[in-house]
Amino acid sequence: MNKPKNSPARKMIAENRKARFNFEILDTLEAGLVLTGTEVKSLRANQANIAESYASFEDGEFWLINSYIPEYTQGNRFNHEPRRLRKLLVSRWEMSRLFNSVSREGMTVVPLKLYFNDRGRAKLELALARGKKTHDKRETEKKRDWNREKARLLRDRG
């Protein structure tokens, strides 16, 4: 049976939850990944970590650095290196826009989510972000605590 057209068919693999706390997210975009066969099999087994990774420009190309995709357990001598550089596939226009923002305005590009889209392709949701200062992080934490307290009070009252 076919899936309805409007249903989100994303199969989430990994999420960088600390990115929204450590960075102020300004813009997001979707990028493809150049992967080997054993990397895809390892991702299908929901094994990946993008918490400490970031994206960078080198030699006119866009690369994902420090992402961890463990070796495929059933793989043999053709297995991959777990922390290798992975090329990101974005359009030329998006790449130039990101490069200008990163080089001029002191921003960074961080991955938010790694998932398979509805066609079964591995995609990475990237964010153009600016690092938060310590006082901004404290303010975010206070807001989160207050929202939890409000929810607790309303739940107990009603």
From Swiss-Prot:
Residue ranges of the TM segments: none
Gene Ontology CC terms: cytosol
InterPro entries: SmpB, SsrA-bd_prot, SsrA-bd_prot_CS
GO biological process, one term: trans-translation
Keywords recorded for this protein, A-Z: Cytoplasm, RNA-binding
UniProt-listed CDD domains: SmpB
Comp. bias (Basic and acidic residues): 136-158
Record-linked Pfam families: SmpB
GO function terms (MF aspect): RNA binding
Function: Required for rescue of stalled ribosomes mediated by trans-translation. Binds to transfer-messenger RNA (tmRNA), required for stable association of tmRNA with ribosomes. tmRNA and SmpB together mimic tRNA shape, replacing the anticodon stem-loop with SmpB. tmRNA is encoded by the ssrA gene; the 2 termini fold to resemble tRNA(Ala) and it encodes a 'tag peptide', a short internal open reading frame. During trans-translation Ala-aminoacylated tmRNA acts like a tRNA, entering the A-site of stalled ribosomes, displacing the stalled mRNA.
Record protein name field: SsrA-binding protein
Source organism of this protein record: Brucella ovis (strain ATCC 25840 / 63/290 / NCTC 10512)
Gene: smpB
